[in-house]
């Protein structure tokens, strides 16, 4: 079992774990690694979100074995509850974000291990409460030079069969039955009756708009991967790969393009093994100019999409006695020159050296460095429906540009000592000790300006002023952590086993009064399928009885929240 820190025998592992092989990843491949894991393991759950649907740029809420933390009102309002139950993600021994996992080159992955319960995740201490996803990439293979290519097509088809919505006549009938066009005041009821007559006239003219299909399309994306690897018997091996992935969402105009490049070098000299992995990731995502799908679910079918001149209407109904603010047509904004784009660049270099003075003893040191730069551009011209109710005095406030830029840098260093030995054929002992230090520093700035009278000018510096009563904003964070982990595992005759793990975690997020916290687990088990009375039970491959107790934690909160 690959835990990301230690490697242990599955026969003596007391935790709940699923190991997914490269063959399974290829057989059940989805549009990204998250959807692939969902196709394979039923405990890996991606929560459905009907607001964002199949938006390729929206980070899904991922859970392993259900919810461990409940969101606050602020989490729901700011849409940050996604982070609360997200599992810890480890790539080749180093933590990565959910966004990075979403854009990984799945052709470079050799296996994925899901650590599900406390006994399995206690070695990660304050980060393991939500489960752990351990990803191992392919190592270069010795032999002749090999060049391989793999391409695929991904088709996203919207399915509206679950939506049973009323047509125009049925919707009007429902409103009439509910008494929407009656009022105790005669002048108000007269205005309501006029609106009712206008709607009936529209229905008689054949207006019956099925809004749900208007912003949707069948998205056809494609993925390409090229891999080169080789190396001789002199101890030097290498591999290089590039991948381009173009994902088109079912919402018109939404897409996500990613590029990944990787160079992996390996050199073995006697009892020393050196590895270096350099990876560059680029991503560009565009949101749909048609807005969110839930807007179209709320629109009345007796509203028409276009006017008599064939142009898309800006307002679906006139402002009057019934509407204090005229309902806007989300299709109108799609005719404008909008910008809603995010880009990021990640450069990661992981280096490790492994020394095996004896067959039973391994000492490994590794360090990972990662830098990320991200930008966000959002432009709405003056004709956008957001500004339709601005007065004449506010004409020079129409048009808006939001620009954000952020940078982050992190390092992660660990030193691991592992000892494994068999005694007298029936006794097997594993002892592991790990020391880990990590830091992540980030900062971001946001500028929000307004005043773009001309819709064809969408450059940030052409704005007339900052947003009213606004100013540039920014944020910064610094997270540090340190941890010492010990693990002892014993198995007798491949039948009876015990496992004990202890970790002392220190983190800047804990606050000054208590910087360190202990986490631990212990478990026992019995491999029933190894007993003699099970030898003739050919239809059963594995039957294990195990029990464990663990204490884990979660630090999914802001860097300075303990100071608040």
Annotated model-derived regions:
Residues 1-8:
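Short amphipathic beta-strand segments in non-cytosolic proteins
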Residues 10, 19, 23-30, 40-63, ...:
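Residues embedded in well-ordered regular secondary structure
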Residues 11, 37, 112-113, 133-135:
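Non-catalytic regulatory/gating segments with a bias toward low-complexity or hydrophobic composition
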Residues 1, 115-119, 124-130, 136-139:
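Periplasmic N-terminal soluble interaction domains immediately after the signal peptide in Gram-negative
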Residues 35, 78-81, 86-87, 92-118:
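Short acidic/polar hinge/loop motifs at secondary-structure boundaries
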Residues 169-206, 294-333, 378-399, 443-472, ...:
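Surface-exposed loop/turn segments flanking beta-strands in extracellular/periplasmic regions
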Residues 212-288, 295-307, 345-350:
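Transmembrane beta-barrel wall of Gram-negative outer-membrane proteins
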Residues 222, 258, 264-272, 277-282, ...:
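Extracellular/periplasmic, surface-exposed regions of secreted and cell-surface proteins
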């Amino acid at each position: 079992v690959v835990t990301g820190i230690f490697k242990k025998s599955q026969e003596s592992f007391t935790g709940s774990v699923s190991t997914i092989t490269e063959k399974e990843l290829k057989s059940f491949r989805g549009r990204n690694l998250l959807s692939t894991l969902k196709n394979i393991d039923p405990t890996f759950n991606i929560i459905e979100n009907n607001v964002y649907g199949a938006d390729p740029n929206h980070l899904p809420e991922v859970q392993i074995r259900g919810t461990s933390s409940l969101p606050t009102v602020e989490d729901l309002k700011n849409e940050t509850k996604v982070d609360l139950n997200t599992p810890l993600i480890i790539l080749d021994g180093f933590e990565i974000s959910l966004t990075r996992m979403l854009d990984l080159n799945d052709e470079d992955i050799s296996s994925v291990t899901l650590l599900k319960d406390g006994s399995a995740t206690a070695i990660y201490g304050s980060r393991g409460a939500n489960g752990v996803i351990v990803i191992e990439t392919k190592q270069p293979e010795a032999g002749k030079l090999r060049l391989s290519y793999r391409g695929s097509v991904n088709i996203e088809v919207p399915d509206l069969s679950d939506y049973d919505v009323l047509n125009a006549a049925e919707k009007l009938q429902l409103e009439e039955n509910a008494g929407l066009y009656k009022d105790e005041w005669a002048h108000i009821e007269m205005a309501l009756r006029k609106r009712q007559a206008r709607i009936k006239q529209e229905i008689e003219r054949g207006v019956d708009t099925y809004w749900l299909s208007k912003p949707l399309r069948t998205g056809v994306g494609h993925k390409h991967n090229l891999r080169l690897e080789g190396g001789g018997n002199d101890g030097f091996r290498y591999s290089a790969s590039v991948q381009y992935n173009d994902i088109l969402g079912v919402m018109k105009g939404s897409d996500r393009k990613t590029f990944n490049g990787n160079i992996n070098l390996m050199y073995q000299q006697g009892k020393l093994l050196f590895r270096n992995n350099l990876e560059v990731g680029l991503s560009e995502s565009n949101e749909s100019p048609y807005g969110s799908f839930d807007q179209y679910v709320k629109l009345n079918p007796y509203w028409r999409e276009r006017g008599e001149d064939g142009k898309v209407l800006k307002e679906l109904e006139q402002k009057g006695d019934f509407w204090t603010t005229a309902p806007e047509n989300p299709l109108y904004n799609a005719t404008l020159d909008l910008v809603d784009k995010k880009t990021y660049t990640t450069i990661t270099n992981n280096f490790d050296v492994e020394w095996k003075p004896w067959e039973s003893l391994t000492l490994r040191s590794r360090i990972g460095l990662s830098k990320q730069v991200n930008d966000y551009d959002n432009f709405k011209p003056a004709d956008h429906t957001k500004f339709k109710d601005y007065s004449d005095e506010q004409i020079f406030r129409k048009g808006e540009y939001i620009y954000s830029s952020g940078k982050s840098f992190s390092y992660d260093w660990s030193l691991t000592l592992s000892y494994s030995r068999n005694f007298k054929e029936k006794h097997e002992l594993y002892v592991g000790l790990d020391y880990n230090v990590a830091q992540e520093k980030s900062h971001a700035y946001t500028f929000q300006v307004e005043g773009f009278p001309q819709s064809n000018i969408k450059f940030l510096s052409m704005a007339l002023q900052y947003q009213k009563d606004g100013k540039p904003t920014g944020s910064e964070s610094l997270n540090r952590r340190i941890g010492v982990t010990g693990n002892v595992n014993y198995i007798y005759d491949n039948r009876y086993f015990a496992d004990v793990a202890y970790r002392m975690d220190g983190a800047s997020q804990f606050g000054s009064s208590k910087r360190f916290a202990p986490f631990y687990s212990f478990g026992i088990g019995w491999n029933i399928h190894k007993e003699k009375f099970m030898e003739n039970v050919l239809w059963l491959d594995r039957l294990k009885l195990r029990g464990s107790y663990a204490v884990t934690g979660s630090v999914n909160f802001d860097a300075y929240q303990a100071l608040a």
